[in-house]
UniProtKB/Swiss-Prot annotation:
Its cofactor is heme. The chain crosses the membrane at residues 22-42, 172-192. The keyword Metal-binding applies. This is Cytochrome P450-like protein L532. It comes from Acanthamoeba polyphaga mimivirus (APMV). Pfam families: p450. It is found in: Host membrane; Virion.
Length: 468
């Protein structure tokens, strides 16, 4: 498959990923009985919940986007008693995100059951704003300049180790590992090489379970829930070890050390939940972004040639020179457009709200998908699903596409880690294609979601380091 010749459409490759829910199963039986006895005159209790359960969240959302009417801005539906609104239109999305009366809501309460008070995954709590400001400060340009050399070295030392000891490489796992090792080294001052691999599978299983969790009440007897608890305990213990090592490290970033001290040992669980959230935001989302970029670039020799020629022009891989590189930055922009780190988020109307003559009742739960907006043919043209870095070369800043390029969200809850994600992606993409030969082996893509958008759950590759 050559991506320069065909478009890779997530819509054509979307697959069912059914969710088993005891609640939905029992409710469906009750619904069937009521429908039978009432001759279908009483509305379904579950609403569209069964469609969500049968197809999985990813296909459910994409199907509704495909089925929308021309010029339809949003789709209101119901999951049980919860009123939902899936937004299709980019301009409306941006206005919702910028509206101070539209904030995190009920769906984040569900996430909090699983992740606790993580900054990226919980509802807003007492320390949330202070932690958010700390993350922004942590990833300031001045700090990114400082960490770039060590981040580069640690990630590629880990890559060299992996291609030496492993015969069969999975690019998904490789990117997760090098990102995790690099992130923990520069942020916490901790070398996690000897413990990184043990985290990947239970953390991944944790995310997959949460992605399919639709139970309003946790059913603790469910075997899948028990597996979730086992994985959660393991992941929390891993974070506990990381925290202990960070406290002893002389190289832990001072901003992060202050956060460790601020939460302290009095609430160990909250501290672990915060660190887990930071680690997830620092390596998991970026690894998924890099997967999409590397896969796309691998299939286009022209892009590789242009990229490597530019690398020759900017041989220094420091932060300043990476920022100066127009073609590399266009590759990263195109990657974040097609593979946004967070593909779906929720917001809640805290009051009755009217936006552009569209009325939304208090309590409405909005589903907002950057993935839909950033692949909208009405915004990005007929090649919206093609990987084409050139589209950013001469983009008019006043154009609709420029205004709706929001891969990291906008407003009061925009992504505090976006600068780090861009930096890490730029480092890996630039160095990987210049100093290594990477070949994608026989595979089948299966786009899916598990918190983040995933181009595939596995991608077999061959990676060889080139001789100088």
């Amino acid at each position: 498959m050559v991506l320069s010749d065909i478009l890779f459409s997530i819509y054509e490759h979307r697959e069912k990923s059914p969710v088993f829910s005891w609640f939905a199963y029992l409710l469906r039986i009750l619904d069937w009985i009521i429908q039978f006895l009432s001759f279908g005159l009483i509305p379904s209790i579950g609403g569209d919940l069964y469609d969500l359960v049968d197809n999985g969240l990813f296909k459910f959302v994409l199907d509704r986007n495909i089925q929308k009417k021309q010029n339809q801005l949003y789709d209101k539906f119901r999951l049980g008693t919860v009123k939902m609104c899936l937004v299709f239109d980019g301009e409306l999305t941006k206005k919702l995100l910028l509206d101070n009366s539209i904030r995190r809501g009920g769906l984040y309460n569900l996430l909090t059951k699983f992740f606790g008070k993580g900054i990226f995954t919980s509802n807003i709590h007492s320390r949330w704003m202070k932690q958010r400001k700390a993350i922004f400060k942590l990833f300031s340009p001045q700090n990114l300049i400082q960490i770039t050399p060590e981040l580069t070295t640690s990630m590629f030392e880990e890559l060299d180790r992996l291609i030496t000891i492993k015969k069969d490489l999975d690019l998904v796992t490789v990117l997760s590992l090098i990102g995790l090792v690099g992130f923990c080294k520069v942020i916490f001052g901790v070398d996690v090489t000897d413990m990184s691999e043990e985290l990947i599978e239970p953390l991944n299983d944790l995310l997959i379970y949460i992605n399919g969790a639709v139970e309003p009440v946790l059913i603790t007897a469910d075997p899948s829930y028990r597996r979730f608890i086992t994985n959660k305990k393991f992941v929390h213990n891993w974070m506990r070890k990381l925290i202990d090592k960070a406290r002893k490290s002389e190289n832990c970033f001072e901003i992060m050390r202050q956060q460790l001290d601020d939460i302290g040992s009095d609430d160990e669980t909250e501290l672990i939940e915060f660190i887990l959230s930071v680690v997830l935001g620092g390596h998991e989302t970026t690894a998924r972004l890099m997967l999409g970029i590397i896969y796309s670039v691998c299939h286009n020799k022209e892009i590789i040639e242009k990229l490597n020629n530019e690398t020759d022009e900017y041989p220094k891989g420091d932060y300043i020179n990476l920022k100066k590189r127009p073609y590399l930055n266009n590759i990263i922009k195109e990657g974040t457009r097609l593979f946004p780190p967070v593909w779906l988020l929720s917001r809640e109307a805290k009051n009755d709200t009217t936006i552009d003559n569209h009325f939304f009742k208090k309590g409405t739960q909005f589903l907002i998908s950057p993935l839909i907006i950033l692949r909208d043919y009405n915004v990005w043209g007929s090649n919206a699903e093609k990987f084409d870095p050139e589209r950013f070369s001469n983009m008019d800043p006043k154009s609709k596409a420029s205004k709706l390029y929001i891969p990291f969200i906008v407003g009061s809850e925009d992504c505090p880690g976006k600068k780090f994600a861009i930096l890490e992606s730029a480092i890996v993409v630039s160095k990987l294609f210049k100093e290594y030969e990477i070949t994608v082996l026989k595979h089948k893509l299966n786009p899916m979601s598990a918190g983040t958008f995933r181009l595939s759950d596995k991608l077999p590759v061959s990676i060889k380091k080139l001789k100088n």
